[in-house]
């Protein structure tokens, strides 16, 4: 049987996601003490420090790490950094398939529009219903984008 403690365990209480403020300040003090400017004449021109690179932290370290508390104990939703800025790549076979389907469809459209037909081969036939269904006599197609926009606006006006 499990027992439930009143407070957080030692592991949770001691767990830190970054350095303490005291550690950060002591490291900053060490870096500032050890850092003594070299006379500019001692270094060649390409090795002289610029105003942008000077600072209390070395270039390899970006400073103290920011710590964000979790909301309701849940991890924040993050997207993969590799997926954010990348563009989708297609294989050669995929591009060939797309090109084939596109060319075939354009050929069918030209033949339907009355373009030159090959006498040897059959022409495409567009389906037209000869006897329409009486239940669809009063059918009116809707624009789904417009319908969703109306639903969205209705939700907004009802909430406020």
Curated annotation (Swiss-Prot):
Keyword vocabulary terms for this entry: Acetylation, Cytoplasm, Methylation, Nucleus, Phosphoprotein
Residue span of region Disordered: 1-22, 43-64
Positions bearing N-acetylmethionine: 1
Compartments where found: Cytoplasm, Stress granule; Nucleus
Residue positions where Phosphoserine is found in the record: 61, 82
Assembly, per entry: Interacts with DDX6. Interacts with MCRIP1.
Protein name (database record): MAPK regulated corepressor interacting protein 2
Source species: Mus musculus (Mouse)
Originating gene: Mcrip2
């Amino acid at each position: 049987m499990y027992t439930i403690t009143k407070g957080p365990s030692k592991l949770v209480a001691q767990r830190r996601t970054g350095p303490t403020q005291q550690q950060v300040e002591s490291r900053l003090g060490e870096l500032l003490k050890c850092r003594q400017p070299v006379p500019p004449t001692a270094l060649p021109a390409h090795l002289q420090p610029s105003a942008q690179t000077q600072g209390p932290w070395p270039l390899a370290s970006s400073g103290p790490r920011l710590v964000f508390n979790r909301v309701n104990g849940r991890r924040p939703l993050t997207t993969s950094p590799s997926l954010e800025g990348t563009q989708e790549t297609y294989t050669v076979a995929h591009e060939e398939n797309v090109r084939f389907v596109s060319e075939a469809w354009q050929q069918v459209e030209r033949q339907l529009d009355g373009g030159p037909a090959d006498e040897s081969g059959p022409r495409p036939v567009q389906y037209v219903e000869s006897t329409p269904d009486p239940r669809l006599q009063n059918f009116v197609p809707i624009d789904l984008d417009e319908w969703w926009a109306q639903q969205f606006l209705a939700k907004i006006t009802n909430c406020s």
